[in-house]
Structures are given as structure tokens and as C-alpha cells.
Amino acid sequence: MALAGAGFDMADFLGTISDTVRPGTARPAVMHAAELEALPAGQVHNPTTLAVAGRLPTATFELFRQTIPPGQSSDMQRHYHETVHYVIAGRGHSDIEDDKEAWAAGDFIYTPPWTWHRHYNDSATEAVEFLTIENSRLLQALGITRRQSAGLCTVAEARARFPEEPAARPGLAAQPDLEDQS
């Protein structure tokens, strides 16, 4: 399975992090923290760690616990799905297109579809913990997923690496891939 580039397939990616949800399949109503499925470091293209609550019976959204180490950040990325991060612990800021937004524990961060974004941990000593909720399962079921990672760069650098394509807007012709330029 390709983790990036032209051979990347979102179905393969999601299949590595959680079971495929089937209606009527027995799944737990409660998933304990110790049962989260950690993604191997090679599947996360940035210094964050992700653990998925993949056994929950969700058909349209995915739940992750995401950790950003002190002084680190996620990669600059964009994707067709919407994402909400609930800040469990820590403080930092996010670049979402041309906006810089500060946040702290208890806040929610919304990332609209197909917007360049990167999340930063502003502490030199404390990790950031997010509960990340994204509707990627729904878009996968509809066959319209797409992700791009520009690596550890600015929004301007990401835009230069990935010029806008008219068909790359959600709701138009899908081009499933993950193009990693890290």
C-alpha cells in the first residue's frame, strides 16, 4: 500500500487504522482509552501521534486522539473532509488559510473542507491533546476523498507547491490521492 503519492488509496489508508463499518455489525458502545488503535509513525506525515477509536459504530465520521509534542506542529495539509478538534489539553495556534487562530484547553477548532491548515503547539514543555472528529468515513463511502500534505511549510509554500485546480473542490470530480511533498 502506498502511503503517499499517486498510488495512495483512501480506502487502504482507512483500512489500516480501523475496521470497515458494516450496518448491524456488533461494536462496542464504549471504547476505553487503552483500546484506541495507534497509527504507526510511518503513516503520520508529521511529528504528531494519532490513535483512532475505530471500533466504535460510527458510519460517517472518524474519531482520533491526536498529540502534538511540545514545540512541534502538524504538517501543512488540506482535505475534502471537515474536521473539528476539541482541545483536551495544552495551548497553541492554527494557521487556517490566511488566518492565525490561538486556542487553549476547552476550545474547538474547525477546519473547513479543502483549506490549507497546520496546528502548532506553542508550549516548550507541555503536549497538546486533541479529540479530532472528521467526516472522512462519509466521504469515503461516497467515493470523494482527497488529501494533500505539503509537509512542514507555510500556507504560501503549500499554495506554490499545489496550484489550485478547479476540479479539486469538494462536490466536483474527485481525484483521490495524497500528494506528500514533505
Predicted features and spans:
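A short, N-terminal "cap"/entry segment at the start of jelly-roll beta-barrel domains
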Residues: 1-60, 148-182
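Conserved short histidine dyad/triad with adjacent acidic residue
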Residues: 47-49, 62-79, 113
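A short hydrophobic beta-strand segment most commonly corresponding to one strand
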Residues: 60-63, 84-86, 110, 125-144
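Short, low-complexity cationic-aromatic patches
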Residues: 54-58, 74-81, 100-101, 115, ...
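Short acidic-glycine-tyrosine-enriched beta hairpin
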Residues: 98-114
